């Protein structure tokens, strides 16, 4: 399986984390932020993460990716759901982008390896 991803993407991290817990090998392909063509060629639009299954079929929803990876062999995500933790995470979603987004392009991440990719990210976030 191949995961098209950004290093700074929390949805990508979710998929990578369950794959690591399972010991499932993923080919991780970091896409530069301004490379919309790679995403569009696979699924017709700009979206990350994209999990390409061994049969070539793409998956777009990170929770579906997590469920698929966890279904291979013995599952590791077997504990009870914790609604109180989910509620805390939901509240954090309101403020986290304001704290993290301005810092991402300052980090030496592969999705920002070119000036054009970094500038593309900054313009997209300013317009959002």
Which positions does each model-derived feature cover?
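A conserved mid-domain beta-alpha-beta active-site/ligand-binding segment of alpha/beta enzyme cores
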Residues: 122-128
């Amino acid at each position: 399986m191949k995961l098209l991803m950004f290093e700074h993407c929390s949805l990508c991290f979710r998929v990578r984390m369950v794959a690591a817990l399972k010991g499932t090998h993923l080919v991780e392909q970091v896409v530069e932020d301004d490379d919309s063509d790679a995403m569009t060629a696979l699924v017709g639009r700009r979206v990350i993460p994209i999990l390409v299954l061994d049969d070539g079929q793409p998956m777009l929803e990170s929770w579906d990716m997590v469920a698929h990876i966890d279904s291979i062999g013995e599952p590791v995500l077997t504990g009870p759901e914790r609604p109180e933790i989910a509620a805390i995470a939901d509240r954090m979603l309101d403020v986290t982008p304001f704290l993290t987004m301005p810092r991402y392009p300052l980090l030496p991440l592969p999705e920002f390896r070119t000036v054009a990719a970094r500038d593309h990210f900054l313009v997209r976030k300013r317009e959002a």
